[in-house]
Amino acid sequence: MLGHDLVSHVRSAMLNKLRGLPVPESHPVLSQLRAGVFVTVESIVRSGGYERREVRGSLGIVEPFKDLAFDSAKVAAKLALSIPRFTEFDLRRSVIEVTLVEGLREWGGDLGSFEWGREGVYVIAGNKKLVVLPQTMIERRLLGPALLRYIESMVGAPERMYKFATRIFYELRPEGEVIERELWKSRVIRQYLEVVR
């Protein structure tokens, strides 16, 4: 239920922003919750008889500013305007993914205690900041030492690193059923864990 409410709220915020209408900043359930939130928009691309998803844009905050209804609507509205040539028509043909971020805590880079598929990373290096969500780790095969190499290649030597827990809610089809992604069950992570054990 939370996933459906959250994705529906985000989609409404994006649609209203694209139409020039006020963005819904409250919700009976979401206004009671506090969490960081990332919103991702993926277009459905059909080519050669296959269908794939292509990220159009992603934006978020690692710590809550206000409540989840307010924060998710503001992030979604800003994202809708930041995607080049993004229209109502594009939104109707796109799937929405919302990642909740909770429990931000310092992390020394210990890979042995890292919960692959459940945790993400927030890194600060000077004026550079980087967020790596669990889905990015799987898509780019950033498991084990590859994650630390990726961080260094993106921001240089990190001054501070944090990890956080996530819950990922995802539309199966545009405006369709919403599921909670269980990335820790992915084949990529299982194969990695078999090798390191």
UniProtKB/Swiss-Prot annotation:
Give one Pfam hit by family name.
AMMECR1
Read off the InterPro entries from this record: AMMECR1_dom_sf, AMMECR1_domain, AMMECR1_N
Q: Which residues form the AMMECR1 domain?
A: 1-190
Question: Where in the chain are disulfide-linked cysteines found?
Answer: none
User: What is the designated name of this protein?
Assistant: Protein PAE0830
